[in-house]
Amino acid sequence: MEVATLGGGCFWCTEAVFKRVKGVVSVKPGYSGGKVPNPTYEEVCTDETGHAEVVQITFDPSVITYRELLEIFFEIHDPTTPNRQGNDVGSQYRSIILYHSEEQKKIAEEMIKLYERKLGKKVVTELVPFEAFYEAEDYHHDFYDKHKNYPYCKLVIDPKVKKFMKNFPDKASIRI
């Protein structure tokens, strides 16, 4: 098994998508990329901890590669806008890849260049070494699956899950 740590806006969105990927064993929402140990959601939302909302993904590389995970990652969020995804604004929503090895770093650098060419814009995704992951509070876990009728889920998360299912049908482990 391998681990990937990615932030692409609200972790409810990224968790909902990556939970549906074949080869993904677990997805945990949390905080990473900052300097404050054991931050709370409220602290992260102040923009003072330096942390981003991220997901930590444990995956089977014989089923899904790190490169394929990054392809999904870049397709389900906007990697060209700093500190924002849609109406979610703040540094905690920034696009960030926290690499766990030099191989992951190399692949991420290649994917950033690929998406800059593909999108015709500068990709602002931060690429930094993984240091620590702080798991989010329980109420953030499986948020989408527990609250599908919540307006945010219908308006923001549903389109991302549907886009993943449409663009990566061979990578989907379950339907909506």
Swiss-Prot record:
Organism this protein belongs to: Sulfolobus acidocaldarius (strain ATCC 33909 / DSM 639 / JCM 8929 / NBRC 15157 / NCIMB 11770)
Lineage: Archaea, Thermoproteota, Thermoprotei, Sulfolobales, Sulfolobaceae
Key word Transcription present: no
EC number, as in UniProt: 1.8.4.11
GO biological process: one example: protein modification process
Biological role stated in the UniProt entry: Has an important function as a repair enzyme for proteins that have been inactivated by oxidation. Catalyzes the reversible oxidation-reduction of methionine sulfoxide in proteins to methionine.
Similarity annotation: Belongs to the MsrA Met sulfoxide reductase family.
Keyword check for Oxidoreductase: yes
Protein name from the UniProt record: Peptide methionine sulfoxide reductase MsrA
Gene Ontology MF terms in the entry: L-methionine:thioredoxin-disulfide S-oxidoreductase activity; peptide-methionine (S)-S-oxide reductase activity
